[in-house]
Structures are given as C-alpha cells and as structure tokens.
C-alpha cells in the first residue's frame, strides 16, 4: 500500500451516465456486499449505486476510518478498502477518481 494521501489527479471528474451499468472489480464488490442494502448476488451497478453504497460503508465505519481532527480524510490503510484503492488515506475530493478505477463497463446489448 502507498503511504500518505492518494496522489490522484482530480481535474477530469466527469461522471458516467445515469443509466450506464458497470460490474466492479472483485475486492470492491466483496466490500459492498457486506452492506445490508446490497443483494449478495447483485453483479451490476450504476455509478450512482456505487457511490451511494461506498458512502454508506464509509459512514457505517466512520468511527474507525475518520479522525476528529480532519473529517475530510479517510484513513483506510488498515481497512479492506485500503487494499482496494491501494492507499492508506484519501481526501474526500479524490473518492470519485478512486471509484472510477474500480468500474468495469457492462457491455450494452443492441437489439436489431
């Protein structure tokens, strides 16, 4: 794992379309499936779903992942999320780029 805050370029944070579907890299999928709200057999998600569930995970674990002195930085080095994102810490503005790296576009099926 890298030390320090994630070194992520946030200059281009355009979000995927509302209806675009993605599968997730296995480790993030495993973490999200620990949430009660996520069906254990679910395999596709929208970008909105992923951000919602990840923020739910972070809030559910805020006592472990955030220090009172700086609530803008998540300390995930000792959490499975640290292995997923390959960082020990990240600033809240970096979350979108970190999530995008975990998304695998689900092929669109075109009907003739």
Where in the sequence are the language-model features?
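Histone-fold and other basic nucleic-acid-binding segments
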Residues: 1-112
């Amino acid at each position: 794992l890298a030390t320090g805050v994630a070194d992520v370029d946030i200059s281009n944070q355009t979000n995927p379309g509302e209806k675009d579907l993605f599968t997730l890299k296995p480790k993030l999928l495993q973490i999200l499936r620990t949430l009660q709200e996520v069906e254990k057999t679910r395999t596709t998600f929208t970008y909105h779903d992923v951000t919602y569930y990840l923020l739910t995970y972070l809030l559910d674990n805020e006592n472990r992942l955030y220090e009172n002195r700086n609530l803008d930085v998540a300390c995930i080095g000792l959490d499975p999320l640290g292995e997923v994102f390959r960082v020990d810490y990240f600033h809240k503005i970096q979350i979108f780029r970190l999530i995008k790296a975990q998304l695998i576009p689900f092929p669109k099926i075109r009907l003739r």
